[in-house]
């Protein structure tokens, strides 16, 4: 299976009443992608509450950052698994 460079573009979200950039919800996604052999790069965007996975310049997966489970390794997070499938199917 081909391994990809995955750019995770994420925007700020409200946590404890404060709008800020946080990667805690992205850790499980990162761990799952790395364990499958992909390289992962984070990039901040202005799109609030949004996460996009970009492979070869194309958006292959999009979700709200709150759809991802906080912390963990991503193995029990169904959204992380859908994202991994989308990356695996990318050209």
UniProtKB/Swiss-Prot annotation:
InterPro entries: UPF0728. It holds the Pfam family UPF0728. Belongs to the UPF0728 family. This is UPF0728 protein v1g117062. It comes from Nematostella vectensis.
